[in-house]
């Protein structure tokens, strides 16, 4: 007998999905987000404590309900349950900035959520009657207004089952799709002949998912890692080991690789709904991204129409491409970005940026709010990027100058707001006087308290302005508003992984920063909501460093997948006479590096790229190279290139060329990672320098943090991030088994064991030479090809 499908859903998602209506209006929703408005739960907890000993706070509730052809498993958390003499009351707490006099009745979705909790609790406890209490609290005055309604169990059951019945048609549609999907997964074979080692890699991924573990994969170019990770993950979904995979990337170009892999599998017969989430600013139909019904016609009535748009796409089994989503949004007159988010709930695979999962201010609440776990598989591509991205996502700063600017803007507009800004500014001024360069601070809690008051005043001001018809506010005000909100959210996360400090920057600006040095704990908060995680990259070296900063588990798996490309196709040279140390920099060294470059490109006509540690260093060497560049075509990366300019730059790398062309680029920039110049489009890479970041306060904080914990602080702060840039830059050449090319490392430090210890295994054969030997070495290599 076939086991009935179990569909898991949070109570919040159920009511918001079925009962949503009206307009998109970020002037309301953007400022009335529950977590932000309750300032990390401070006021929430205060109200709960005031309710006495008969009040149970944060009660988890679950219900598995038999439906037509499936089981619905609902999960949620009631803010409180109050036992009052013979009455049972479900309490739902919401924060508001408006005057409580204007809150005349509960918001329908809020009430529906509480009624669901009431039904579940009454059903489980065998209650004939139960009350629902909506508690609204003004964040400025902390005044409270309550609405209480009593229901019989029969009333709640009738209402609840009707709600579930409205959901059933969606569930049935999904179940039918999953049957088709799983049947196709079972018959879909690996789309290529397995390369050497590729089957073992795919098997490692499947085993990891089966055991619900994490896996770190160092997979050099040529191992076919994308398909070796994606295919077993899809297979695992077909075996019920997961119900949705998230393919997470740091850059747009990597998303394209994932899309191509899905397309290849679909050509082999796979039925699998995959969707790529495009940033709101890119997919928006309007010139300005203003999400409210006054500025955007697609926002007006969006929620009245969007479910029909989603159901139509799913029922007709339309492909969830950006183009089809934009067409559907036009046809149904809805926001394309919000439509894509709704469709992602019904997709089997979601390709998106890291921040949709990990960023506390931008993650997809429909999947990751309320701490409700799901059978998710996380595939994290180019995972070496997640350390710095994690630090950025879980850190926050406030600048004194921004506070002062907004204070001046508000001077004649709102006295209470100005007073709050003045209070924050005064405290920052005191802290600034104690700071010469940067200063570690034991606690910024007094500052956070003042920011809480400021946020409340800003919320109140925005609400009053909106009610008066003044929706538009100065950019500086709104930017500070979001910065304050983020700072307070991050403040709630503070633990031993953080350093709090103040800094007087070189330009005179003063900031207070909450710096997440080790993001592993915060990342794990989201990863544990899924079943399994695969971290993979061509430059995940040393793996122990990444395991330390990306995971909190001690028993994670790790695999090193070596490239099986012929060793003879690659020539690795280390320039013994070059150095990028600050003490060695100057005209003489720039000339020497220019000589190395010239000798390299003279070895064979074709396309080369030289990667430099900074734009300034690149320009200094370029000035010398131009004196000896006769017959060499130059193409140069500039700062702040547009998408079109980047494409034009890459188009210069044609396969056929009867003279040398040399690109001047910067390590860590857009051309040092993710670009795929195969065959003769690129035959050589010169990496100038070790990639070590410049010494700065934040790097020193990282160094000292790990030194104090008995770990190699210099390596964590400087060496490992620098060598990652080197490996990424060098990885631009030799992308397929037929490619042939050279890698020249220009810095005498590459001869040191400290650096060679971080070379991938494929680099075990290299030669050290001076610039006068380079041309001969090049010619010898190319003659043997």
Give the positions of each predicted feature.
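A contiguous, basic/glycine-rich beta-loop/short-helix subdomain that forms a polymer-engagement track
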Residues: 325-350, 361-368, 461-579, 584, ...
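Conserved pre-motif I regulatory segment
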Residues: 176-218
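A substrate-engagement module of RecA-like helicase motors
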Residues: 188, 241-350, 358, 437-442, ...
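Conserved RecA-like P-loop NTPase helicase motor core
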Residues: 576-588, 638-751
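Signature of the SF2 helicase/ATPase Hel1-core->accessory helical subdomain module
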Residues: 229, 256, 332-349, 353-459, ...
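Mg2+/Mn2+-dependent nuclease catalytic core
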Residues: 63-157
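Walker A/P-loop
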Residues: 210-232
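Metal-dependent nuclease catalytic cores that hydrolyze phosphodiester bonds in DNA/RNA
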Residues: 1-86
């Amino acid at each position: 007998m076939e086991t009935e499908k179990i569909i898991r859903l949070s109570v919040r998602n159920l009511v918001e999905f079925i009962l949503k209506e009206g307009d998109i209006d970020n002037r309301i929703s953007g400022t009335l987000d529950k977590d932000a408005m309750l300032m990390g739960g401070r006021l929430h907890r205060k109200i709960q404590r005031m309710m006495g000993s008969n009040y149970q706070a944060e009660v988890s509730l679950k219900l598995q309900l038999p439906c037509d052809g499936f089981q619905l498993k609902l999960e949620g958390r009631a803010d409180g349950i109050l036992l009052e003499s013979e009455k049972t009351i479900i309490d739902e707490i919401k924060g508001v900035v408006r005057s409580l006099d204007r809150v005349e009745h509960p918001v329908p979705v809020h009430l529906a959520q509480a009624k669901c909790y009431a039904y579940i609790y009454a059903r489980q406890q065998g209650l004939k009657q139960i009350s629902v209490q909506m508690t609204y609290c003004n964040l400025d005055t902390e005044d409270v207004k309550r609405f209480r309604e009593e229901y019989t169990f029969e009333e709640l059951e009738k209402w609840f089952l009707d709600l579930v019945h409205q959901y059933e048609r969606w569930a049935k549609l999904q179940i039918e799709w999953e049957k088709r999907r799983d049947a196709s997964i079972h018959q879909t074979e690996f789309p290529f002949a397995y390369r050497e080692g590729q089957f073992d890699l795919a098997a490692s991924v499947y085993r990891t998912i089966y055991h619900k573990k994490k896996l770190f994969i160092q997979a050099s170019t040529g191992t076919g890692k994308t398909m070796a990770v994606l295919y077993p993950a899809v297979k695992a979904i077909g075996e019920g080991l997961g119900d949705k995979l998230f393919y997470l990337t740091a850059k747009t170009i990597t998303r394209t690789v994932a899309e191509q892999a899905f397309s290849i599998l679909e050509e082999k017969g796979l039925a699998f709904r995959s969707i790529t989430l495009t940033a709101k600013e890119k997919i928006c139909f309007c010139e300005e991204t203003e999400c409210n019904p006054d500025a955007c016609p697609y926002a007006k009535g969006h929620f009245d129409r969007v479910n029909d748009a989603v159901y139509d796409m799913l029922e007709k089994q339309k492909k969830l491409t950006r183009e089809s989503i934009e067409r559907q949004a036009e046809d149904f007159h809805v926001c394309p970005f919000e439509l894509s988010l709704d469709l992602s709930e019904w997709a089997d695979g979601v390709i998106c940026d890291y921040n949709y999962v990990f960023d506390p201010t931008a993650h997809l609440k429909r999947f990751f709010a309320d701490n409700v776990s799901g059978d998710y598989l996380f595939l994290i591509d180019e995972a070496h990027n997640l350390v710095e991205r994690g630090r950025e996502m879980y850190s926050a700063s406030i600048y004194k100058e921004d506070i002062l600017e907004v204070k001046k803007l508000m001077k004649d507009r709102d006295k209470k707001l100005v007073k709050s800004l003045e209070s924050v500014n005064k405290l920052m001024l005191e802290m600034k006087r104690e700071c010469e360069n940067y200063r570690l601070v034991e606690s910024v809690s007094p500052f956070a308290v003042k920011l809480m008051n400021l946020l409340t005043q800003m919320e109140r001001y925005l609400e009053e302005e909106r009610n008066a018809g003044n929706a538009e506010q100065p950019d500086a005000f709104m930017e500070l508003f979001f910065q304050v909100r983020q700072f307070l959210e991050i403040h709630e996360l503070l633990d031993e992984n953080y350093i709090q400090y103040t800094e007087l920057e070189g330009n005179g600006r003063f900031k207070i920063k909450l710096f997440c040095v080790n993001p592993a704990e915060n990342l794990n908060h989201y990863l544990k909501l899924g079943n399994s995680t695969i971290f993979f990259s061509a430059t995940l070296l040393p793996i122990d460093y990444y395991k330390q900063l990306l995971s909190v588990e001690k028993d994670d798996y790790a695999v090193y997948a070596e490239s099986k490309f012929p060793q003879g196709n690659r020539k690795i040279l280390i320039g013994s006479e070059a150095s990028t140390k600050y003490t060695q920099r100057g005209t003489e060294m720039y000339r020497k590096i220019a000589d190395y470059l010239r000798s390299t490109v003279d070895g064979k006509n074709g396309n080369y790229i030289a990667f430099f540690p900074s734009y300034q260093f690149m320009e200094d060497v370029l000035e010398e190279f131009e004196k000896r560049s006769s017959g060499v075509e130059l193409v140069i990366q500039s700062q702040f290139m547009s998408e079109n300019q980047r494409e034009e730059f890459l188009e210069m790398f044609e396969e056929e060329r009867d003279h040398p062309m040399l690109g001047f680029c910067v390590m860590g920039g857009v051309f040092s990672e993710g670009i795929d110049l195969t065959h003769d489009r690129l035959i050589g890479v010169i990496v100038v320098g070790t990639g070590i970041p410049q010494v700065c306060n934040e790097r020193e904080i990282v160094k000292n943090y790990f030194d104090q914990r008995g770990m190699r602080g210099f390596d964590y702060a400087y060496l490992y991030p620098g060598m990652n840039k080197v490996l990424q830059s060098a990885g631009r050449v030799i992308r397929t088994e037929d490619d042939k090319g050279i890698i020249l490392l220009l810095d005498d430090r590459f001869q040191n064991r400290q650096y060679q210890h971080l070379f991938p295994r494929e680099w075990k054969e290299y030669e050290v030479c001076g610039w006068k030997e380079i041309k001969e070495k090049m010619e010898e290599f190319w003659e043997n090809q």
